[in-house]
Amino acid sequence: EFARNVCDLKSADHQETNQFAEEPVISKLSCSLVGETEIVNIHSVGSIMHKVYAAKSILAKYHCNYGFNQSYAKLFVENDLILTAYSSDGAVRGFELKEHPFFIGTLFQPALTSERDHIDPLILSFVNASEQHQK
């Protein structure tokens, strides 16, 4: 929706649901990340993700075959999307919308690093932001 309505990419689509997408903003990864774990670097000091994790890097787990198409990065950044998290090889792993209380997207799945006694901080932050929004 961001690509279509803010970036004006009327044909923006996800290759998982449309393998012939004209504007594949989410495209098939060259290597599947299903079951993978990697260190994700958080670059944007002051971003929500940086505040939530209070770290320059985190250990992240995945269950995906598709990811952000890097060829759209410049356009998204020009439209106030902050690319906040990257893999060690520079692939985008997380983003957030500037000036929004909690518009965050990640390629990794915070639920996969959560345990009964330790819920991933990004999930807790989302719950807290939701509660604040209801007030």
Language-model segments: what does each one mean?
Residues 1:
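Phosphate-binding active sites in nucleotide-utilizing proteins
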Residues 5-135:
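Amide-donor transfer/coupling interface in amidating biosynthetic enzymes
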